[in-house]
Each structure stands twice: as structure tokens, then as C-alpha cells.
Amino acid sequence: GHNITIFVADRENRLRQIEALDEIPVYGMYLRSPVSSQYPLRAMVMCCIWFPITMVQLIWLARKKRLDAVLIQYPLPAMFYFGILKRVFGGTLFITYQGNDAHDLCLWDRREQRLVRFLLEKADLVLGVSRTLLAKVESVLQGVHLRRSRQLPNGAPLDVIRAVKAGEAGSDLPPSYLLTAGHLIQRKGIDLVIAALREAKERGVVLQLVVAGDGPERENLIRQSCEQGVSDQVRFLGNQSHRQVLSLMKTCLAFVLASRAEGMPLVIAEAMACGKAVIASNIDGVPEIVHDGTTGILVPAEDSGALATGLIRLCSDVAFRETLAKQGKEWACREYNWEAIAHRYLGFIEECQAHR
């Protein structure tokens, strides 16, 4: 019963409808940030020139769609313009932090941080996919006072997961393998998983690893696997579609996430929903989904020895692995159901509107 409009970043200076997703209109327009660490004067001048034109078009959209609640998924520059729109039309303003947008705050210059701090304090509600992410925002933006904040994770595509069959990703895979998936960058900690394979091998346990994903660290990781004598135990598949990754999850022995930093990694919930045991780094929002010994195993960050110990236990103790998988699946299907999360969104909107 709610009318929804999606607004996305675009290259065009004029507001236009780009497409429709499930009959939901998607509009786009280029929004210029009023601040820039590289070109501060240029950013300010261009924003001043285009600001009236931009606001007129956004006001037209707000009137046409009768907007009474705006949910922003990335702070700048959208928060600047829709924050002003809130002053004109009233309504409820939500700002959501997903992960990198919070972790990268410390890289922004002081002007950008001051602007974000000011706008966050004007928001009706600040949402974070994890409680630790909200704490990160408050620690970086020292002195910021979030009037209201809530933790609300993203949902897992449970209907898609149920429809995916094991084996869709191909048959040229080890019979029993560990899976890790993601962008191959230093932050994802794939190097730690490879180091854990070497340590497990030194203890007499040979583990097979499948890596789904690509990125700038691929060649370094291949070189590392050769140098550590486990190249025959690691299979790099390159980029895979989301459906292929889900299929790999359904056929793997267990899922591994050894990241050095995360927000609330949805890939863990997806692996759990696929009925697989999970082992992950004890960082950021991960402990909010992986409850050590109950829905998965947590290991200290950047500790390949502890990771090796956890992997060996998962692979050798079948009863323990199956218990984690069962309890993790129940947790994921209950807590990361999109319908339940949508009801929580609506509850937050109604709560904020009642306090206006």
C-alpha cells in the first residue's frame, strides 16, 4: 500500500526516469557535492551554479510523488540535497550506513566530515547494518550527536537461495572444498586463508579451497599459494554470478570469511541460508551474525593459526559442522528475511512520523 520511488546517481544534469524495477520508477540525476578535498573551490562554484536548477527538479519530484519519507543509502552528496528538501517539505529523513561509507569517513577531509556531522544531526533516524558501524561513525565524527539511531541489517534473497540448485556452478570442483567469495583486495583477507591452508598442511591436514571472485590481488594470491606450497589446494574461479556463488555455497563443506574489516557481510547470511557452517574473523559487525559455537566459528582477525585450527575442526568434526549449519540456517532465515526487515522499516517510519 506504499508508493515507492527510487532515485540513483546519474550523469545527466536533468532529472529523468531511467527505468522501472518491478513497476517501481527509477529516477536519476547528477548531484554535485558542495565539498571536495581535491578541488574545493571548483566544487563550491559548480555546486552554487547548479544548485537552483537541481533543487527545482527535486522539488518537482517531491511534489509529483508526494514524498513523505526519504531513505538515503550513501551520505554525500544526496544527503546534502535531500536534507534541504526535508526543510522545504517536512517529511522523514533516514540515512543508512552500509560499510565502506562508514569505514572511509576517516579518509575524508575536515570540511566533508563537518558537513556530514551537521546533516546526520538533522536526520530523523540514522540506520546502520551493524551496531559497530554506527559506533564507527560516532568515533570518526567526534562530537556528533545522533539523535536517533537503530541497527537494521540488509536481507538475504531467501527465495533465490531456495531456487538455486547445487551443481549449477559446474562439476570441475574438488569433492570436498572450503569456499570464500568476494573482491580480491587486501581487506578481504584471502591471503590469511591461504596461510591457514599451509599451517593445516604442516599439521597433517590437507584442505581444498575454492575462491570465487576477482580483483587486483589475484596475481599476488596465486604467487603466495605457490610460495607456500598449497597451489594444488587452491582453485581460483574468477568472477561468478550471484547465482553461481549461491550454487557453490550449496556444494561446499563450509564458508570462510577472513576479512580485516567489514560492515555487516551479507555473504555470511547467504552461506548460512544455504545450510553451510561458517568461520569468520571476529571484526566489526560479524559477531552480530556469527555467534561463536552456535551459528558459526569466530577467530581473531589476522590470525592464520587460529583460522587453521577452526578449519581443521570444521572439516574433521562432522557432527559439530552439521549443528552449526542447522542453527545458522535457522538464524539467517529468521533474522534476514526481507519481509520482516521491510516491516521494521515501516515501523521506524511510523515511529518517526509520530514524533514529528
Q: What annotation goes with each model-predicted range?
A:
Residues 8, 27, 95-98, 116-163:
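Donor nucleotide-sugar binding/catalytic pocket of nucleotide-sugar-dependent glycosyltransferases
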Residues 260:
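Aromatic "clamp/platform" in nucleotide-sugar-dependent glycosyltransferases that forms part
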Residues 2, 105-106, 138, 147-149, ...:
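Acidic anion/phosphate-binding donor-loop and adjacent secondary structure
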Residues 222-240:
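Nucleotide-activated donor-binding/catalytic signature segment of Leloir-type glycosyltransferases, i.e.
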Residues 169-188, 194-198, 210:
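Conserved donor-binding/catalytic core segment of Leloir-type glycosyltransferases
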Residues 239-240, 247-252:
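Short alpha-helical donor nucleotide-sugar binding micro-motif in glycosyltransferases
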Residues 292-293, 297-304, 313-318:
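Conserved acidic donor-binding segment of nucleotide-sugar-dependent glycosyltransferases
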Residues 277-280, 290:
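Short hydrophobic beta-strand element within catalytic cores of glycosyltransferases
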